[in-house]
Amino acid sequence: MLMPKRTKFRKMMKGRNRGMAHRGNSLAYGDFGIKAVEHGRIDSRQIEASRIAMTRKVKRQAKVWIMVFPDKPLTAKPLETRMGKGKGSVDKWVMNIKPGRICFEMAGVGEELAREALALAMHKLPFKTKIVTRDSENELY
């Protein structure tokens, strides 16, 4: 699973996820990609499930880039625990996703196979996404 090697602080405040993505909103390496259309949070298990779905579909012919990294700790208290007694322990690592953010990129295969593989990965994500290409990436969200 993806997670930082070390952080300055173990726990982080929840914060807010507002606005559009100003960086990471265009294809950097590949010819096809998955772009977020709405706000959301992606965790390391969802990233890994999407990566496995894509690579199995293309049978390792394509190069896949993961353009997101979960760097925010999400805490949870144990079940049947009373309120209080401090913040819970770190449960999983997530990344806040803003609309316009490219999550995955792919190159090295035809457009039809790439669209099928990216569609499989899109089903693993908890927010609405769309497939973009080098030609269509400048469209509105």
From Swiss-Prot:
GO terms for cellular component: cytosolic large ribosomal subunit. It comes from the Bacteria. SUPFAM superfamilies: Ribosomal protein L16p/L10e (SSF54686). GO terms for biological process: translation. InterPro entries: Ribosomal_uL16 (IPR047873), Ribosomal_uL16_bact-type (IPR000114), Ribosomal_uL16_CS (IPR020798), Ribosomal_uL16_dom (IPR016180), Ribosomal_uL16_sf (IPR036920). Keywords: Ribonucleoprotein, Ribosomal protein, RNA-binding, rRNA-binding, tRNA-binding. Belongs to the universal ribosomal protein uL16 family. Binds 23S rRNA and is also seen to make contacts with the A and possibly P site tRNAs. This is Large ribosomal subunit protein uL16.
